[in-house]
Amino acid sequence: MRTLAIDIETYSSVSLQKCGVYAYAQSPDFEILLFGYAWDDGPVEVIDLARGESLPEELQNALYDPEILKTAFNASFERTCLSAFMGRVTPPEQWSCTAVMARELGLPGSLEAVGEVIGLPEDKQKSKTGRALIRYFSIPCKPTKTNGNRTRNLPEHDPDRWAI
């Protein structure tokens, strides 16, 4: 069986922490910004949906193929968001959650902490820079004179940051 590892970055004006993943993904302004994936143990590829790229048909089909195991850290989030994005439920029995696996082994609950505990090299761990970028582009911002009174940071507002 092939494995498709998935990591998405998203935006919604609804607070994930306050309202949960279903309300977050059902918000009218919800979108998937980046779709990162790797087949089996292959290299990671990233699709920049925020910049107009689209999911290849192979990936769209893979999301529903029972012969392909989909994995993610906190798979419920990826599955729910992808279901909203695709307009069709992705079958939960086709997913494996690496966060659950980590907890079963007595490891911490955050991806960052798991990477540290198992001794992943820094370039393979969730980076603090990456976390700051996710917050910048994925969470609504307060309107200020400096930012032109916008409530959201888009890639075109800071192309250099987006390129990281």
Predicted regions span which residues?
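Active-site-proximal helix-loop-helix substrate-binding element of RNase H-like nuclease domains
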Residues: 30-32, 36-37, 41-164
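Entry/capping segment at the start of metal-dependent catalytic domains
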Residues: 1-30
